[in-house]
Regions:
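Serine-dependent protease modules
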Residues: 1-181
């Protein structure tokens, strides 16, 4: 409804780039939350945002992949789309064809810095879990093992006498971690 309101930051999570804000307002419009687990590759999606300050812009595309991990990122099971995401779109909703929010547009993957058809959204169930933890504990807790894992390539498979290069090798156990104590 285009109202602008003051907000208090309750908590933030750097890994997912999700923040929980508190506002004082009545009669706010609501969106329906969808289930990103039932998404299929090829399904249509719609992103809404304010690219370059152009308010209420919508761009459409399809789901390109699910549970996508990005290089050099802590694991978040991103929804990959080909929706045009530009500066100002991040943080906006990603809708399914039923008008339900299934994700939060997060980032693009680009060598040039511009849109190249690779956009990523945080699944809404992941974002909602982050929000619940921020609300309940003021922070997000994540489990960790404390190991460095290495993919088994052909050379490692041969060195260890494996029939084929598959799986992972625990390359290092970090000190004073759950793995170290186990």
């Amino acid at each position: 409804d285009r109202r602008e309101l003051e907000a208090e930051v309750i908590g933030t999570d750097e890994r997912t780039d999700v923040a929980l804000l508190k506002i004082k307002a009545d009669n706010l419009p609501v969106v329906h939350i969808g289930n990103p687990d039932v998404l299929k590759v090829g399904q249509p999606v719609l992103a809404i945002g304010s690219p370059f300050g152009f308010d209420y812009s919508a761009t459409a595309g399809i789901v390109s992949a699910k549970s996508r991990a990005l290089p050099n990122e802590s694991y978040v099971p991103f929804i990959q789309t080909d929706v045009a995401i530009n500066p100002g779109n991040s943080g906006g909703p990603l809708f399914n064809a039923n008008g339900e929010v299934i994700g939060i547009n997060s980032q693009i993957y680009s060598r040039s810095g511009g849109y190249m058809g690779l956009a990523f959204a945080i699944p809404i169930d992941v974002a909602m879990d982050v929000v619940e933890q921020l609300k309940d504990k003021g922070k997000v807790s994540r489990g960790y093992l404390g190991v460095v894992i290495q993919d088994i390539d052909r050379d490692l498979a041969e060195a260890y006498g494996l029939a084929k290069p598959a799986g992972a090798l625990v390359a290092k156990v970090m000190p004073d971690t759950p793995a170290d104590k186990a």
